[in-house]
Amino acid sequence: GTFEHIDVPPTLVSFAVDIAKEGIKLHLSRMMCPAHISETIRKVKALLKDKSHPIVRVIATQLVEAGVDIDFPVVFRQESGLDSILQAAGRCNREGRNTVGTTFVFSLAAEKRIPFGAMKAANNARLNLPANSDWFDPSTMTEYFYQLYCRKNTFDDKDMKHYLYNPNELCFETASKKFRLIDDDCMNIIVNWGNSMELVEKLKESGCTYPLMKQLAKFTVGVHSSDFDKLVSYGAIEEVLEGIYVLTDRVQYDKNTGLSLDNHWMEELLMI
């Protein structure tokens, strides 16, 4: 496979939008519930095998970078950490149908859209690599992770070793409270997809049971607490049982892109 790095000027962005009107477009992100994601992945695989649809585009988040077995002739990935870029490249020509598969790494800096937070740190670590680095070389990946975790000391940014360093004062309880493998302030919301609303009615009638909650997990979307508060302010959320929330405004969940955090009522008012 090969990589190309391109800077995307604003004129090319608008041109790409026009070109993308051709063919079939599908979306994949965690704003879709697991059942919706699974259905879309099955649809993508079927379309890629169907020769009557020569152009199939999937606009996706990092969701596709691990554990999603789909094969495209070309991949475009916004600049990010080297590990994420290689994961995205793994969806390109993975079945070897073409002689070479190409992954384009593009920058939206001209659009003032640059990575932030953890993505910014990962992207900067990649940019610190020598310009002639072979991204497929394992030693390059070793150097990348050194840049990411060792130079900036981001591997232990919670300073966990401070609580576990002194054998005479091992603060296990404090370390346990501070440790988070994944920083997660998510609130789960049951959305309207498939037979989810029928299951919600059963939940109201029969109460919370393990088999029922296991079924409902397929129709759940996790959002940050700040986004959850937005949806509550729109009047789009109902607490059906303590700690169990349902998206009651069906317009907030789109059949193509999943849960929307925008206030569609405000948009409708602006259109009047």
Question: What are these model-predicted stretches?
Answer:
Residues 1-4:
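Conserved RecA-like ASCE P-loop NTPase motor core of nucleic-acid helicases/translocases
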Residues 6-11, 15-28, 32-34, 38, ...:
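C-terminal helicase lobe and adjacent C-terminal extensions/tails of nucleic-acid helicase motors
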Residues 21-24, 68-74:
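Short, surface-exposed connector motifs at secondary-structure boundaries
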Residues 33-61:
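Conserved helicase ATPase core of P-loop NTP-dependent helicases/translocases
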Residues 55-64, 68-72, 187-192:
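Beta-edge loop/turn motif
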Residues 57, 74, 102-104:
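Structural motif
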